[in-house]
């Protein structure tokens, strides 16, 4: 009987001593990297990020974005007089894509519970933006004066050329035509957003990030570099071009993200 009392007295201590084993301790990973798709209101591309954990709440990172950039009034058209004509953007001077490279901070708002869920962080970053502008080349229709047959010449689009009208443009030329005439303009960007990470495994990154980006290609009132900074991005003719852009973005990371 005394043995039974003794066991009953020790039973509560035995229960409490086992309780910590029920709690799952999450690993704080020091490093992260991800590569994914970038969609924004004026184009699309890809993005990447390398992150270091400072503590439980704060992280810092280096990032890059590579994406196309369209003019808001850019509209694709086609010469309806020819069934095999190619689509093109009438009035487009340059095909433009941008490369962003910058530094940012990330702050934890809501962590995942032990049973899963969504990890939510606020992000902010800034850096340099490089805009690459490749001139547009088109296939132009001409008619032989003697045979009256049509033939095609590949020419750089010129809005002042009387032959470069919707009636005489057959379509776009190869994208690679004009690569050797590409121009570079330099600016900067600011980005703010929210990141929603939902992977079931802690060492995997699967996330959706959404926010806004401001790109500016004018620094001060005077151009201190005459070869790019301060100029408008000449994307379209026949309409006003801008040197600053405000876009909404979504980054999708699914396959190429990990923590260690």
Can you say where each PLM-predicted feature lies in the sequence?
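Bacterial Sec-dependent N-terminal signal peptides
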Residues: 1-22, 246, 252-254, 259-260
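Short loop/turn motifs that connect adjacent beta-strands in outer-membrane beta-barrel proteins
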Residues: 19-31, 53-61, 93, 109-120, ...
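Flexible, solvent-exposed coil segments and beta strand-coil junctions
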Residues: 22-30, 76-87, 166-175, 228-230
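Residues that define the transmembrane beta-barrel architecture of outer-membrane proteins
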Residues: 29-33, 40-44, 58-60, 95-99, ...
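Residues on the lipid-exposed face of transmembrane beta-strands in outer-membrane beta-barrel proteins
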Residues: 37, 46-50, 101-107, 126-130, ...
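N-terminal, post-signal-peptide region of Sec/Tat-exported proteins
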Residues: 44-77
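Outer-membrane beta-barrel translocator/channel fold
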Residues: 65-100, 104-115
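Outer-membrane beta-barrel transmembrane domain signature
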Residues: 123-209, 213-241, 254-260
